[in-house]
Amino acid sequence: MAKSALFTVRNNESCPKCGAELVIRSGKHGPFLGCSQYPACDYVRPLKSSADGHIVKVLEGQVCPACGANLVLRQGRFGMFIGCINYPECEHTELIDKPDETAITCPQCRTGHLVQRRSRYGKTFHSCDRYPECQFAINFKPIAGECPECHYPLLIEKKTAQGVKHFCASKQCGKPVSAE
C-alpha cells in the first residue's frame, strides 16, 4: 500500500475555516490533520492534542492541598505524575516516585543532602536538595568518605574495565581512592 493512501484516512471532523472534511496527512514532522480542500484551504493542526497531561485515573479520597479538589493520575511528556483535577486553574503536581535521598550531606553548602534526580533526557544524576540556592551536582553515584589527598568530603563510584572504583569527587583532585 502506498504511503499517500495510508495518510488520507477520513476523520469525520469538519474544517473550522471552510467546513470541508479534515483528513490525516503525513508531513516532515509526522502525521497531522489537514483540510481536504488543500491548497484552496490551508488549515492544519497537530494530530495529538497539545494538552500536557491527560487524565488516566481519578484518585478517590486523595485531595489537592492547594484547592481541596480531587487528585488525578496524569500522563505527561515526562511520564506519569499526580496532579489536581482543576488544572489549569490549580497547578498542584506531585511526583509518583519520590527521588532517592541519600544521607550524604552536600559538600558545597554543608546543609543540604544529595538526592537522585533525572535530567530531561533521562540521565540520572545527584544534586543538592536545596537547589536553586545550592547548585552542586554530580553525574556519578556519591559515596560517603573523604579523599586522603585533598580531604574533600565526598567520593564518587565509577565503573571501569577493572571493576568498580572510588574516586575523589573534587574536580581539582579526581584521584582514585583505594577501598579501605
Curated annotation (Swiss-Prot):
Classification via InterPro entries: Topo_IA, Topo_IA_Znf
GO cellular component: chromosome
Alphabetical GO biological process terms: DNA topological change
Gene Ontology MF: a single term: zinc ion binding
Matches recorded under Pfam families: Zn_ribbon_Top1 (PF01396)
Similarity remark: To H.influenzae HI_0656.1.
Entry protein name: Uncharacterized protein YrdD
Organism of provenance: Escherichia coli (strain K12)
Source organism phylogeny: Bacteria, Pseudomonadati, Pseudomonadota, Gammaproteobacteria, Enterobacterales
Gene: yrdD
